[in-house]
Curated annotation (Swiss-Prot):
Signal sequence, renumbered to the chain: none
Modified positions (Phosphoserine) in chain numbering: S426, S1068, S1083
Bias type Basic and acidic residues, positions: 350-367
Highest classification ranks of the organism: Eukaryota, Metazoa, Chordata, Craniata, Vertebrata
Protein name in the entry: Protein TALPID3
Organism per entry: Mus musculus
Region (Required for centrosomal localization): 485-572
């Protein structure tokens, strides 16, 4: 309802807004109701009573009766009628329009007419439409009922029809007809209940509708009743309050009269005494008094009234302070806290009439002053009401006092009362001033308290009157002047009375004050105890509101007076300004004193600000000065000077957090109060993504002054506060006409496009992370034309801006509108943190959060600390910037982080040299190319890794499998390949390969397995061919002595115990395996370095020849010889490294570092020095490889004897082949290491190259290979290990107690192993899975492996110094245990344990196991080696027991299965047996020798060490 008005009293109770009524009305009605409302806005008041009847009769203007629907409409309109304003006339009612605006009061008063109003109101919504709709609805409802009945009848009729049809159909005998009839009958039968239900539902719905209408009617009636009751109650309460007020007034009047009587009595008594004192003149005085009675009879009322007013006002003052104290818990001295006075207290003359005259005149003046505003002010109302009370009391007092008594007495009383009026004028005015809340005087006053106070006043007044009575006689005495003595006495008396009067006044005031205070406190306590807090709070709020209103009025009045004075007295404007200011100050001081406890400080401050600044426009009409000031404000707004802009928009973002925070002309978020260190939004401009600037540089306190716009002006767009921001895009304009405040005004912004985040490889669009909620202005300054490297087609620039607000307020992102920028000019590298890596190598770069900002073309002084990228020179090295971004000082201002989500494993870095040169700005088209390149590089690197690690792992497994294949060619090979593939997938998904892929993208096991299988097929074929070739070459080139020498060189590192070489003779099948291996690899030479691997084998053989003395070496030589060729095939890069290491034995080998000497010999995998006896080194990445060297350095004396048999041509070649297989495993690991190098990748120092699952020997600083890889590598062979009877569970790390085992124990274990080798070999044929080595084949565990394997291997009794390494530890057990320890690296080690005879070596091509043993020992290399030796001895003993069982198995699998394991496993297998042999032969001290890191790399044996470190988590790593 547009015109709905609410009476103040009833408006509060209205619960239904007019709009709802309108909404409820049916649409048909609603259309015309508005028209009707316009026509007849009001309903006659008499009609309000008829509302109820209207529901029943519902006669429309058309005369049609309204149905139940009419009732609902009536209900709908009923309440609007209540809400409707008072009906104008009945004539209006005669109109058909229904007026919903009947005033609530009249509606209730006139209930009879309400019914008619209701009808009308129903049709007011559009009576005709309502009637039509009602009729339509009724018509519809009737047809519905009819339809329902019809349906019911139709059901029967349909049944009859169906029967008829059935009867008809038989003659026709048409099946279709019967079917149709049946269908119709069924449909009818089914429809009939539905129709019934529908009709029932309709009937029920109608009933429910009627019930609802009734309920609504009853509800409305109940509302009316409740409203009426509430109104009646309120009226009763009001009446009660008024009655209470009246009673109070009457009581006060009675009180005053009583007091006056008492005063009169006292005065009479005093007069009698005075008469006695003035005997002679008493008669004359009486005459004069009789005359004076007529003169002063009019006056008597006023002085008496003054006294009465005083007494009354004292009570009032009591009451008011009580109310104030209850309301404001803190003001306890009512007399001292008067409300602000409208006028200064006027000194009261001795004549009471003057006081009465002056106060009314002043009141009139004040009223006149207030009258111009047209508002009766609250203070004036209070004062006027108080004055009315005083006037009433005055009238009553006059009536009581005008009765003349003894004239002189009356005159005396008059004079005394005048004195009272003089005494109490201030109290009177205080009383009036202290009644800001006249209403509550009645509520708050306590009659008993007031009686006591009045009694006290009477008691105190009596002495005053007694002495004052003397004073009234003085004028009479002056008139008589019969005797000067009398006059003198009177003068004395007068002076004494005056003095007494002063003292009494002071005392009286003090007493009254104390009594009032006591009464007030008691009364407050009573109120506090009895009153509810809600009431107190309500009163307090009310008083606060009144005080605010009064203070506003006072201020306005003062303003008005000041303005009037300025207008009327321009000469004195200055003086009057000073006066007005002083008045303002005084008024403020009064307000402070009065209201400080009441008004909250903030309010007071606002008041003061409003007073001395432009006063805010209030509901009160603005005074002249206010209008002037408002006019000034308007002019200021129109001008939009800087201050105004600052107010509206806050500071420009570039101004940062200047001290003039709130004066900044640009938008602020919440215009936060300045803080100790205000947060500066960090604005990062993105141009070319190369120059990074934080907002600190732009919004620095000093930067604002230094900001110089370079080629183009940046227009900071002020962001609207929070949600109000709307953006308009006007790309054609560099600066939008509107600053972004308009709705739909999008801001064209040149934002660099980030690489699409299509997949893990692609870079996500730069995320602008605003850390601080400060408004962030993303000012993308367009690079000058010179900056634009490529003037390509301008394309819309898009950036995804993520606002991360650390604070509750989301930062308003004020986006600067910039002309569309050529994206090509801006390199997307801003998102990447660098231009997309020029080469696929960059793809592997670890994800960097690059703080890249477009170069600020704003010239910033050099004072600023350049953030990374601030210099374009710096921009060139984007990667350096990325490194520096960590160094970027964190500013409180929000920073824009462009997060490149592609997370490449930092472990492998195939990218270019580390500060790469930034490529020229790439057009957007290049971005996709770079993304694709990056993807390809990642895929290639992934494939390479898969090839390297998996091939190293699987090939290492394949060789043992092939060895088995020699026994069980097809079955074992298939088994090995299958578990390897599954393991590869598992390993890649688990960790190694996953690193190469975006962290978010899971590795597809199918894809990985596919790549792995393909790569493996190729690489394995090549590697196997290379191994065969290399083994054959090694066999041909080196005599067994040469082999021994080769192994000595290889084992020079390993210090393989000589005794180990004695292989169990039954190893003959292994050579067959070797031949099989050789045949397969021969077909395809290793990509990496088959020749190098073969050369490595040869070198080892040469070294072996160089160190032929070590018999054991010859056995290791065999292993290494076999190892190198496949190793090269496995990982050509690693093979290069291994070749380099192998070449370390020969000075020719290039240093793996591709640079000068390694900082440490250990790190140098090729270091030749480590070959003989590398100094014991704590297990480092390098140690793993050097361990084999260490053991080689520790040749076991029994070994030379086997080495002698090794020279035997037949056995030697087989042995060489077997060792070559072992060495091939080593070299495979080495080749794996080199493989990356073969890829011609430059390995950064921080880069770790892993073949998948390959445990590379950890190169110490530079080439650290994660030992974790062993797990992945071992995972491929886990199944095979589980297939084996490995005592440790698959993946189980068996930490053997580092028991100090002596060489004797190791030798015994080796001997046991040797004895068991035959058995193990026999068992191998039976038990070994493709990837597994028979226990006889298993290499003796390294010391670390022994430790991991535990005492089982170590417990093996030494057979012979040479044998124990092969035979004592069941290579399977030892290596498996070591593998378990080393992450199942050695799981498949089936090399024969303990020394083997040359015959055995020849028979068992896998005599290579000696080397793996040696490597195992090497893995133990470091201070732990003695412990490792002990543990190894224990482990060998265990293995000896196991090997005794397994020894009979052919040794053929020795190293081959090791290779199935991760390269580290291979190295362990290769080095393991040799190492074990070495360990067996070498004292624990030798075993403790740490392998140099270089040797570790050089020998895949180091891989065994790595397997010890990483794979044998507990054994290798823990041992060290």
């Amino acid at each position: 309802m547009k015109n709905v008005e609410f009476s103040l009293e009833r408006g509060q109770r209205l619960k239904m807004p007019a709009r709802k009524l309108r909404e409820i009305v049916s649409p048909n009605q609603g259309n015309k109701l508005a028209v009707v409302e316009d026509e007849l806005p009001r309903v006659p008041p008499a009609l309000a009573a008829n509302k109820r009847l209207a529901v029943e009769t519902r006669t429309s203007s058309n005369g049609t009766l309204c149905g139940s629907l009419d009732l609902t409409s009536a209900r709908l309109y009923h309440q609007p009628l209540l809400e409707s304003p008072p009906a104008s006339k009945k004539s209006d009612f005669s109109k058909d329009a229904v007026v919903r605006q009947l005033p609530l009061n009249k509606t209730e008063e006139n209930n009879a007419p309400k019914a008619n109003d209701i009808f009308i109101s129903q049709y007011t919504m559009g009576q005709k439409d309502a009637l039509r709709t009602v009729l339509k609805q009724k018509a519809q409802s009737m047809p519905v009922f009819k339809a329902v009945k019809v349906h019911l009848f139709e059901d029967t009729s349909t049944e009859k029809n169906t029967v008829a049809q059935e009867t008809e159909t038989p003659p026709n005998r048409i099946d279709s007809a019967t079917t149709v009839a049946a269908a119709t009958a069924a449909a009818i039968a089914t429809a009939a209940p539905l129709i019934k239900v529908q009709s029932d539902l309709e009937a029920k719905v109608n009933c429910v509708g009627e019930l609802l209408t009734k309920l609504q009617e009853t509800d409305k009636q109940l509302q009316r009743v409740t409203e009426h009751q509430a109104s009646v109650q309120s009226k009763q309460e009001k009446v009660h309050c008024h009655d209470h007020d009246k009673q109070m007034n009457a009581f006060m009047e009675q009180h005053i009269r009583h007091l006056e009587k008492l005063q009169q009595q006292q005065i009479d008594i005093q007069t009698h005494f005075i008469d006695a004192a003035l005997k002679a003149s008493s008669l004359q005085l009486g005459m004069s008094t009789s005359r004076a009675v007529g003169k002063y009879s009019g006056k008597l009322g006023s002085p008496s009234v003054g006294s009465s007013v005083f007494s009354h006002n004292t009570f009032v003052s009591k009451r008011v302070p009580l109310s104030e104290d209850t309301d404001f818990d803190g003001q306890k001295s009512p007399l001292e806290t008067p409300a602000p006075r409208r006028f200064a207290p006027v000194p009261v003359s001795r004549d009471g009439k003057i006081t009465k005259r002056e106060s009314p005149t002043e009141e009139k003046e004040n009223m006149e002053m207030n009258s111009p505003k047209g508002n009766v002010r609250l203070l004036e109302q209070v004062l006027n009401s108080n004055e009315c009370l005083t006037r009433k009391t005055e009238s009553s007092d006059i009536t009581s006092l005008t009765q003349p008594k003894m004239g002189w007495n009356l005159e005396k009383r008059d004079s005394t009362e005048t004195l009272h009026s003089q005494i109490f004028p201030s109290s009177e005015e205080r009383g009036t001033a202290q009644v800001p809340v006249p209403k509550y005087n009645d509520v708050v006053h306590d009659l008993g308290q007031k009686k006591q106070a009045s009694d006290m006043l009477q008691i105190k007044q009596s002495p005053v009157t007694l002495r004052l009575s003397d004073h009234p006689h003085n004028p009479a005495l002056l008139q008589t002047t019969n005797t000067r003595s009398v006059l003198k006495d009177a003068a004395k008396i007068l002076r004494g009375v005056q003095n007494n009067k002063k003292v009494l006044e002071e005392n009286l005031e003090a007493i009254v004050r104390a009594k009032d205070g006591a009464a007030m406190y008691s009364f407050i306590n009573a109120l506090a105890t009895n009153r509810e807090m809600s009431e107190k709070i309500r009163i307090r709020k009310q008083v606060d509101e009144w005080i605010k209103i009064i203070s506003a009025e006072i201020q306005d009045e003062l303003m008005r007076k000041d303005y009037e004075q300025k207008r009327f007295d321009p000469k004195n404007q200055r003086n009057k300004k000073a006066l007005t200011m002083s008045r303002d100050i005084k008024a403020n001081n009064q307000e402070k004193t009065v209201n400080r406890s009441v008004i909250p400080r903030s309010h007071y401050q606002k008041q003061t600000q409003e007073q001395f600044t432009s006063p805010p426009v209030r509901n009160l009409p603005a005074s002249g000065p206010q209008k002037e000031r408002s006019g000034l404000l308007k002019s200021a707004t129109t001008l939009q000077d800087e201050d105004y802009m600052l107010q509206i928009y806050g500071k420009p973002v570039y101004q940062g957090h200047r001290s003039t925070l709130k004066k900044g002309p640009y938008l602020r978020f919440s215009s936060p109060s300045p803080k100790a260190k205000p947060q500066r939004p960090r604005v990062i401009e993105l141009v070319k993504g190369t120059k990074v600037k934080s907002a600190k540089t732009q919004t620095d306190f000093h930067a604002a002054s230094r900001m110089k716009m370079d080629s183009k002006i940046q227009h900071p767009i002020t962001a609207l506060p929070h949600a109000d921001q709307q953006y308009m895009v006007s790309p054609s304009r560099e600066m939008p006409t509107v600053s972004g405040t308009l709705e739909g005004h999008l801001i064209p912004m040149a934002i660099l496009l980030g690489q699409t985040q299509s997949n893990s490889d692609s870079m996500p669009p730069a995320g602008v992370t605003v850390n601080k909620p400060r408004p962030v202005t993303v000012t993308t300054s367009i690079p000058p034309a010179s900056r634009k490297g490529n003037a390509g087609v301008k394309k819309p620039n898009v950036a995804i801006v993520e606002m991360k607000s650390e604070k509750k307020d989301p930062p308003q992102l004020s986006v600067q509108i910039l002309p569309s920028v050529d994206i090509d000019s801006v390199s997307y590298s801003s998102t990447d943190g660098a231009s997309s890596p020029p080469s696929p190598k960059e793809a592997s770069l670890p994800p960097l959060h690059t703080w890249i900002q477009t170069p600020d073309f704003m010239k910033v002084d050099e004072e600023e600390v350049p953030l990374p990228g601030t210099n374009f020179d710096e921009v060139i090295d984007v990667i350096q910037e990325e490194e520096k971004r960590d160094e970027i000082p964190e500013c409180s201002a929000p920073m824009l982080e462009f997060n490149r989500s592609v997370k490449v494993v930092p472990t492998k870095y195939n990218g270019p040299s580390f500060p790469p040169v930034v490529s020229a700005y790439h057009p957007t088209t290049d971005i996709l190319d770079k993304v694709i390149e990056r993807k390809e590089t990642l895929e290639n690197s992934l494939i390479q890794w898969v090839e390297q690690e998996i091939m190293s792992r699987i090939i290492s497994g394949l060789f043992p499998l092939q060895q088995q294949a020699r026994l069980d060619a097809s079955v074992s090979v298939s088994e090995a390949s299958e578990p390897s593939a599954s393991d590869i997938v598992a390993g890649t998904s688990s960790g190694a390969l996953q690193r190469m892929v975006d962290a978010r993208v899971p590795v597809n096991s199918d894809m990985v397995s596919h790549f792995v299988n393909e790569a493996l097929t190729e690489t394995i074929a090549v590697m196997l061919a290379d191994r065969e070739a290399e083994r054959q070459r090694a066999a041909a080139t080196s005599v067994p002595g040469d082999l021994s020498g080769t192994e000595t060189n290889l084992l020079a590192r390993v210090c393989a115990p000589v005794a180990t070489p004695q292989p169990t003779p039954p190893c003959s099948p292994s050579p067959v395996r070797e031949h099989v291996r050789v045949k397969t690899p021969d077909s395809s030479p290793c990509e990496s370095d088959p020749d190098a691997a073969s050369s490595i084998k040869e070198i080892r053989v040469e070294k072996g020849s160089d160190m032929p003395a070590v018999m054991l070496v010859s056995t290791p030589t065999r292993t290494p010889v076999a190892t190198p060729p496949p190793a090269a095939a496995l990982t050509p890069t690693l093979s290069e490294t291994s070749i380099d290491k192998l070449k370390l034995s020969s000075p020719e080998l290039p240093k793996p570092w591709d640079s000068g000497d390694l900082p440490l010999d250990e790190e140098n995998p090729n270091s030749l020095q480590e070959l003989p006896h590398p100094r014991a080194v704590v297990m480092s990445v390098a140690n793993e490889e050097p361990e084999s060297v260490d053991f080689s350095a520790q040749p076991a004396p029994p070994e030379p004897a086997p080495s002698a048999p090794l020279p035997e041509g037949t056995k030697a070649p087989s042995l060489q082949r077997v060792p070559s297989s072992g060495s091939s495993t080593l070299e495979n690991t080495l080749s794996t290491v080199t493989e990356t190098e073969t890829l011609d990748r430059h390995i950064s120092e921080g880069e770790i190259l892993f073949s998948c699952g390959q445990n590379l020997a950890t190169k110490r600083p530079g080439d650290l290979f994660l030992m974790n890889i062993n797990d992945s590598l071992s995972s491929t062979l886990q199944d095979a290990l589980e297939m084996e009877d490995d005592p440790p569970s698959e993946g189980q790390v068996i930490r053997r107690p580092h028991k100090k085992r002596h060489e004797d124990a190791i030798v015994a274990l080796l001997t046991k192993q040797q004895r068991e080798l035959l058995v193990s070999q026999q068992e191998e044929d039976l038990d070994n899975s493709v990837g597994e080595l028979s226990e006889g084949q298993r290499l003796v565990l390294k010391a670390a492996e022994d430790i991991s394997a535990g005492p089982s291997g170590q417990m093996l009794p030494p057979t012979s110094p040479a044998e124990p390494s092969y035979q004592h530890a069941d290579p399977r057990l030892v290596l498996q245990q070591s593998d378990m320890a080393s992450g199942n690296i050695c799981e498949d080690l089936c090399a024969s344990h303990g020394p083997m005879s040359l015959r055995e070596l020849e028979l068992q091509p896998d005599s290579n196991l000696i080397l793996p043993i040696t490597h195992t020992t090497t893995a133990v290399s470091d201070g732990n080696l003695p412990e490792a030796a002990e543990d190894f001895s224990q482990y060998q003993q265990k293995q000896d027991s196991d090997i005794k069982q397994v020894e009979h198995k052919p040794i053929q699998r020795h190293l081959t299965s090791v290779r199935n394991k991760p390269d580290s496993t291979l190295s362990q297998h290769q080095g393991g047996p040799a190492d074990l042999l070495l360990i067996a032969h070498v004292s624990p001290a030798r075993m403790s020798v740490t392998l140099p890191s270089a040797n570790l790399e050089d020998c895949s044996q180091s891989l065994s060490t790595s397997s010890m470190h990483g794979g044998t988590e507990s054994s290798g790593t823990d041992t060290f």
